Design a protein with these regions (language model features):
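Conserved ABC transporter NBD signature motif
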Residues: 59-69
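Conserved ABC ATPase signature
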Residues: 133-137, 141
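ABC ATPase nucleotide-binding domains
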Residues: 231-232, 236-260
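Conserved structural motif at the start of ABC-family nucleotide-binding domains
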Residues: 6-8, 20-23
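The feature captures the beta-strand-to-loop junction immediately N-terminal to the Walker
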Residues: 37-39
Length: 260
């Protein structure tokens, strides 16, 4: 079993009187893609923001066996990267310059920074936009650009890296949805990264994730493999939706279909 590199214990959160997360315990392992799933308002993005520190808290959260609050920001930035659901940037940077921002924690020359940024821009299919102004890009192009930025940020992390992605496919077309999740899976399998990704598409999650964590009304109701997690009974409980689960005709993962 792979090493636990990110853990959260007894995580609870309220917004006013509303319970958003209710006593969540979660372990994230190196070399695996873990997908956080659930309906709107289930607590997926809030949990991810707590795990990465975007929402400050005193919860028992540890990276590589060391409590989150004991990490120096300069050190954690080399090992832990977060791609938020929305990235607000209005200054007219070149697209390439936005990706180069990911290299700020690294000790690189300007030439090395540009070379690295272009490498990840090629992976995310935004190389042709390198000299374009960031505000002129579409939502999907910006999303792929920021994926290149966080991949750049983790370039020097060795095998101690945690990549967190909050709905990274929400603005993408079909081909780029798959390419984004292939990049995430490749990081897990070839670089031993621990990848945590918030998704809505159960079939994408089933195809690319090793583990599915299902949230419902702020509670963790399942943490298991796709085959064990995606049962019609559990899907109906979590999503109030009747479904049929079948095996993909050529690949070994379950697919979810409407029951009627």
């Amino acid at each position: 079993m792979n090493q636990i590199v990110l853990s959260g214990k007894n995580i609870s959160m309220k917004f006013g009187k509303r319970v958003v997360l209710d006593d969540i315990n979660i372990d994230i392992r190196a070399g695996e893609v873990t997908a956080l799933l659930g309906p709107n308002g289930a607590g997926k993005s809030t949990l991810l923001k707590l795990l990465c520190g975007e929402i400050s808290s005193n919860h028992d959260i540890a990276y590589f066996g060391k409590q989150k609050h004991d990490w120096e920001p300069e050190k954690s930035a080399k090992h832990i990267a977060m791609l938020p659901q929305h990235s607000t940037l209005t200054f007219p940077f070149l697209a390439r310059e936005v990706v180069e921002l990911g290299a700020i924690p690294l000790s690189l020359s300007n030439k090395e920074t540009t070379k690295l940024a272009l490498h990840y821009m090629e992976q995310t299919d935004v190389m042709h936009l390198a000299e374009s102004l960031y505000p002129s890009l579409s939502g999907g192009e910006k999303q792929r650009l920021h994926l290149a930025r966080v991949m750049t940020q983790l370039h020097q992390s060795g095998e101690e890296r945690i990549l967190m992605l909050d709905e990274p496919t929400s603005a993408l077309d079909l081909a780029h949805q798959h390419n984004t999740l292939k990049i995430a899976r490749e990081a897990a399998k070839t670089q031993n990264a621990a990848v945590v990704v918030v998704l809505h598409d159960l079939n994408l999650a089933s195809q690319y994730a090793d583990r599915l964590v299902l949230l419902h009304n702020g509670k963790l109701v399942c943490d298991d493999t796709p085959w064990n997690a995606l049962t019609p009974e559990r899907i109906e409980h979590v999503y109030s939706y009747r479904s049929i689960v079948t095996k993909h005709p050529t690949l070994d993962f379950p697919q979810v279909h409407a029951a009627a």
